[in-house]
From Swiss-Prot:
CDD domains: Gnk2-like, STKc_IRAK. This is Cysteine-rich receptor-like protein kinase 22. It catalyses: L-seryl-[protein] + ATP = O-phospho-L-seryl-[protein] + ADP + H(+); L-threonyl-[protein] + ATP = O-phospho-L-threonyl-[protein] + ADP + H(+). It comes from the Eukaryota. One of its GO terms (cellular component) is membrane. The gene is CRK22. The modification Phosphoserine is found at S482. It is found in: Membrane. The active site is at D478 (proton acceptor). Residues 264-273 have a biased composition (Pro residues). The modification Phosphotyrosine is found at Y426, Y526. It holds the Pfam family Stress-antifung. Keywords: ATP-binding, Glycoprotein, Kinase, Membrane, Nucleotide-binding, Phosphoprotein, Receptor, Repeat, Serine/threonine-protein kinase, Signal, Transferase, Transmembrane, Transmembrane helix.
Length: 660
C-alpha cells in the first residue's frame, strides 16, 4: 500500500511538469485475431479507406460491411452533428489510419478522434449495429487533466453534477432521425464563475436505444467522479458512447454557445494541459482558464523534486500511460454477488408469488410479475426442479448470460437461490408474448405486415447476437412464438435462456438425451438423434418465420386419415412455393397492406432454413444480410426436412388450414 502511494506521488509530480500524449484508440484484446495481409485484413483496409467519403457524405454517420463469412468486416464512422464535410472527412481519415497502423491483428477496434472535430471509427468481425452488449460498455478508458479545481470553489460539485445530469438526459433522448449522428448527442455549458464556464459534450452511437445510451453515459460520469472528481477536465470513451468536459471549448462543438469572457490572465499561471490523441494536439478553440481554477504546485526544494522526477519517470513509464485508467470488470466473486438477489426481496416484489402476479407457466417454471421498492418492474421465473442444474452451474451460467445484452434479447438482471429453489430475474417487457397476438383471431389484426417484418428481422438479429457472442456461444434450442416477448413498440425480445446450452469459444455442437424443445419447432437431427448446433436454431427460426407470415401454428394442419401423412405448415408452404402461389400463405387479417416482394423473400428464406441437411441451411449472418439487402442473391430451396417423402403427389391445396 505504501509503495502504491509512493508511486502515485511520483507520477503526480511528474505529471505536474507535463502531460504525456494519450491516444483514444483502442485495439480490443481478448477477442479473435486475424492474419496480417490476409483476406480479412484486405477487407478491413478497404472498408476503412472508404469510410471518410461514406461518412462525410451521409450526414455524419455510416455503417456497412464488406466480405463474406469469416472474412466479413463491419465498420462504423460517425462525426458530431454540424461538422463540416471537410472536418468530418479528415477526422475519419485520421482515425481510420491510426487503427490500420496500430491494431495490427485485432478483429475489433475503435478510435474516438478529437481533432479537427470529434469522430468515431470502429470495425469488427461481428455485426454490432444496435448492440449494447457488456463488452460495448466494459472495459472503457478514461483520460484526465492533471490540474485540480481550487478548494475555494465550493459550488463546483453541484454545478458540475447538474450540468452532467441534464446533458445525459438530453443526449439519451431519441430524435426523429435515428440513423443520423444528431441522435443521442448534446453539448451544454454552465457558469462556474463570472468569467469561467464548464463545457460538456456527450454522444452515443445513434443506433442504440435511449435506455442503453443513458446507461452508458451514466457509467462514464460515475466512473469519472469516483476517479477524478477534482480534476479540471477529462473524458471517458467506450465503443458506443463518449463523455467529455473541460474548462475550455473543444472539437469545434460549441459554436452556438455564448461563452463567458475571461479576464486577462495573470503572469506565470499555466493553462491546463490539452488532451489530444496521438501526436496531434492542435486545437484552435478557446482555452483560457482563470488563475483561481488551476492549482499551482509549488515546490520549496527544486533539487529534491528533480531527483524524485528522475526516479519516478521510469516507474511511471512502465505503467504504459500516465493518465489512462482502464476499468475492468470486478472479480467473478463480486460479479456474482452483484447479480444475486435476496429471497426476501424477490418475495416482496411478487407479493409472495401471489396468483394475481402470475404471468404464465411453462415446462421449466412459473413466471411472476414483480416490482421492487424503487419502482423497477421485473419478471421473476421460479424454476421447477426439472431444470436439473446444480447450484454452482446455475450461478455460473446466470452470470454469463447476464452479460449478454442486445435490444432483441430480454435482459437477465440477476438470480436468487433459496434452499433448493432457483429464481431468474428478467427485465419486464410490457406486452405479452408473440403467440398471444399471432394465434388469436381477435388480436391478429394488431400485427400488420410492417410489424411482422420488423419482428422477423429483430428475432434474426437477436439469434445472431447469441451465436456470435465473443465470450461464449449460446445455442438457444427453444425458439417458439411463446418465447418471443414484445415491448411497448412491438419490438421482439427473445426470452427464457433456461434451455440454452452454454459453450466455450470453439465448441458449437453437442448431444443431449433431453429432447426438451416443443417438437414442432425441432430440426430433424435434433428430434431423431438429439444432435444440435447453430443450424438447429436456424431450422426453428424458419418455422417461426412461416408462423409469423401465416398466423398459423406449425401443427395446425389436420391429418386426412390414419393412412395419410400429417401435413403441417412447412409442407403446405413448400407446396404453395412449388406451385408459384406462395402469397396464399399470408395471414388474411393483413389484407392488402403488404409488400409482395418482402413476403416472398421471407417465405424463401424460411424454406432455406428448414432444409433437412443442416449444411444446406444458411448461417444467421447470411440470413440477416438477406433480410436487410435485396441485392444479395438467395439460392433456390430444396425439399424441406420432415417432408412426407412417400406422398409427394398428394395435392396439398385441397387441405385447409385450421385456426391456431
Amino acid at each position: 500500500m505504501k509503495q502504491r502511494s509512493f508511486l502515485s506521488i511520483l507520477c503526480f509530480i511528474l505529471l505536474a511538469f507535463g502531460v504525456a500524449s494519450v491516444s483514444a484508440q483502442t485495439c480490443i484484446e481478448n477477442r479473435k485475431y486475424f492474419t496480417p495481409n490476409g483476406t480479412y485484413d484486405s477487407n478491413r483496409r478497404l472498408i476503412l479507406s472508404s469510410l471518410p467519403n461514406n461518412t462525410a457524405s451521409q450526414d455524419g454517420f455510416y455503417y456497412g460491411s464488406i466480405g463474406e463469412e469469416q472474412d466479413r468486416v463491419y465498420a462504423l464512422g460517425m462525426c458530431i452533428p454540424r461538422s463540416t464535410p471537410s472536418d468530418c472527412f479528415n477526422c475519419i481519415k485520421g482515425a481510420a489510419g491510426w487503427l490500420i497502423q496500430d491494431c495490427v491483428n485485432q478483429t475489433d477496434a475503435y478510435y474516438w478522434a478529437l481533432d479537427p472535430t470529434l469522430c468515431l471509427v470502429r470495425y469488427s468481425n461481428i455485426s454490432f449495429s444496435g448492440s449494447a452488449a457488456f463488452w460495448e460498455i466494459e472495459p472503457q478508458y478514461l483520460v484526465l487533466n492533471t490540474a485540480t479545481i481550487a478548494s475555494d470553489l465550493t459550488d463546483f460539485k453541484n454545478i458540475w453534477e447538474d450540468l452532467t445530469s441534464r446533458t445525459i438526459t438530453a443526449a439519451s433522448a431519441a430524435r426523429s432521425t435515428p440513423s443520423s449522428s444528431d441522435n443521442h448527442y448534446r453539448v451544454d455549458f454552465a457558469n462556474l464563475t463570472k468569467f469561467q464556464n464548464i463545457y460538456a459534450l456527450m454522444q452515443c452511437t445513434p443506433d442504440i436505444s435511449s435506455d442503453e445510451c443513458n446507461n452508458c453515459l451514466q457509467r462514464g460520469v460515475l466512473e469519472y467522479q469516483s476517479c477524478c472528481g477534482n480534476n479540471t477536465g477529462g473524458y471517458v470513451m467506450r465503443p458506443i458512447c463518449f463523455f467529455r468536459w473541460q474548462l475550455f471549448t473543444f472539437s469545434k462543438a460549441f459554436h452556438n454557445i455564448t461563452l463567458a469572457t475571461p479576464p486577462k490572465p495573470p503572469m506565470n499561471v499555466p493553462r491546463p494541459p490539452s488532451v489530444g490523441h496521438g501526436a496531434n494536439t492542435t486545437d484552435n478553440d478557446s482555452r483560457g482558464v482563470s488563475a483561481g481554477i488551476v492549482v499551482v504546485i509549488t515546490v520549496p526544494a527544486v533539487v529534491i523534486v528533480l531527483i524524485l522526477v528522475v526516479l519516478g519517470f521510469f516507474i511511471c513509464w512502465r505503467r504504459k500511460s500516465l493518465q489512462r485508467t482502464e476499468f475492468e470488470s470486478d472479480s467473478d466473486v463480486s460479479t456474482t454477488n452483484s447479480l444475486q438477489y435476496e429471497f426476501k426481496t424477490i418475495e416482496a416484489a411478487t407479493n409472495k408469488f401471489s396468483k394475481s402476479n402470475k404471468l404464465g407457466e411453462g415446462r421449466f417454471g412459473e413466471v411472476y410479475k414483480g416490482k421492487f421498492s424503487n419502482g423497477t418492474e421485473v419478471a421473476v421465473k421460479r424454476l421447477s426442479k426439472v431444470s436439473g442444474q446444480d447450484t454452482k452451474k446455475f450461478r455460473n451460467e446466470a452470470v454469463l448470460v447476464s452479460k449478454i445484452q442486445h435490444r432483441n434479447l430480454a435482459r437477465l438482471l440477476g438470480f436468487c437461490l433459496q434452499g433448493d429453489g432457483k429464481f431468474l430475474i428478467y427485465e419486464f417487457v410490457l406486452n405479452k408474448s408473440l403467440d398471444y397476438f399471432l394465434f388469436d383471431p381477435e388480436k391478429q389484426g394488431e400485427l400488420d405486415w410492417t410489424r411482422r417484418y420488423k419482428i422477423i428481422g429483430g428475432i434474426a438479429q437477436g439469434i445472431l447476437h447469441l451465436h456470435q457472442d465473443p465470450q461464449l456461444t449460446i445455442i438457444y434450442r427453444d425458439f417458439k412464438a411463446s418465447n418471443i416477448l414484445l415491448d411497448a413498440d412491438m419490438n421482439p425480445k427473445i426470452s427464457d435462456f433456461g434451455m440454452a446450452t452454454v459453450f466455450g469459444m470453439e465448441e458449437s455442437r453437442g448431444n443431449t438425451n433431453w429432447i426438451a424443445e416443443t417438437f414442432v419447432y425441432m430440426s430433424p437431427e435434433y428430434a431423431v438423434h438429439g444432435k444440435f448446433s447453430m443450424k438447429s436454431d436456424v431450422y426453428s427460426f424458419g418455422i417461426l418465420i412461416l408462423e409469423i407470415i401465416s398466423g398459423k401454428k406449425n401443427s395446425s394442419l389436420y391429418q386426412n386419415d390414419e393412412t395419410t401423412t400429417a401435413g403441417n405448415l412447412v409442407t403446405y408452404a413448400w407446396r404453395l412455393w412449388r406451385n408459384g402461389s406462395q402469397l396464399k400463405l399470408l395471414d388474411s387479417s393483413i389484407g392488402r397492406n403488404y409488400q409482395s416482394n418482402e413476403v416472398t423473400r421471407c417465405i424463401h428464406i424460411a424454406l432455406l432454413c428448414v432444409q433437412e441437411n443442416p449444411e444446406d441451411r444458411p448461417k444467421l449472418s447470411t440470413i440477416v444480410s438477406m433480410l436487410t439487402s435485396n441485392t444479395i442473391s438467395v439460392p433456390a430451396p430444396g425439399i424441406p426436412g420432415f417432408f412426407p417423402q412417400s406422398r409427394r403427389e398428394l395435392d396439398p391445396l385441397s387441405e385447409g388450414l385450421e385456426s391456431g
